[in-house]
Amino acid sequence: MKKIISLILALAMVCGAMFALASCASNEGCKIGVQQGTTGELYLKGDADMAFAGYSNIECKSYSTAGLAVKAMLDGQINYVIIDNEVAKALVNQNPGTKVIDIALSAEEYAFGVDKSQDNIKAALNELLAEMKADGSLDALFAKYDALEYDDDGNVIGGDENIVGIDSADKDNNNAAGQLVVATNAAFAPFEYKKGNQFAGIDMEIMKALADKLGLELVIEDMDFDAVVTSVGKNNIDIAASGLTIKESRKQAVNFSDSYFSEAFQVLIVPTSNTEFDSCKTKADIEAILKAK
């Protein structure tokens, strides 16, 4: 599958400034920046579901976008950044004075979270995803969003002129059987975002295709990310679609579909002047250095 360069710019677009801090050798200790709610944050803080031990010796600084984390590094507020590999590549391209340590620290897969009582929806969705993988339309969908342009906060500001927005019908609890109600957090382009009063993104297009396949009216409910998974099965919400990483704890609330994106992994961004990771060959090499901070 073609990797998502668009996601990347969604989280980047930062003005670069040369960075003077080369390592964590300061009285304040080591600080690493992450995007809030991402696997990178879980990796640093620790997460039993994903078998992450975390780093009690490192201060995790969370930012609303990866671009802001890199800006903080360039400004000397933090030492490194941990973020998705494709995001990292674009951030480094946008910001002179930075480089990627291209060794995977973690891996994740994205899937949709379906109401446990609706196996028919899960079956139809898995069938749809299999068809899209087989005929190349899933790859084409990812490629379609490569041209997105973003501001510093990750908001789409261009590149989607040829993308048709998706309307959400009004929710009708008296017609639950005739509607597919999707929970999302429409602030994660290219997977989901608002285009005026409409929705757009990879996840949203897959949900529209699923609704059409099932002969249902599509309803999209935009909410805080933390509520997306837990909302499923309540108030007639059928499915969660929000760039969801498959996690054991989430399986308590939903049944996951087959994965539709499995190329994400976390890497380290450091200042160009930093050489302490240059000889690293494996994840263990990097982790040994981080644990010694």
Protein language model annotation of sequence segments:
Residues 1-31, 36, 44, 84, ...:
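Gram-positive cell-envelope targeting signals
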Residues 2-12, 16-31, 139-208, 213-217:
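N-terminal hydrophobic or amphipathic helices and topogenic motifs
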Residues 27-64, 85-86, 186-189, 199-212, ...:
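Bilobed "Venus flytrap"/periplasmic-binding protein-like clamshell domains
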Residues 38, 111-152, 204-213, 270-287:
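Extended ligand-binding regions for polar small-molecule ligands
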Residues 43-48, 53-61, 100, 130-176, ...:
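Ligand-binding clefts/hinges and TM-proximal coupling segments of bilobed small-molecule sensing domains
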Residues 89-129, 148-167, 186, 261-270:
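Periplasmic-binding protein-like
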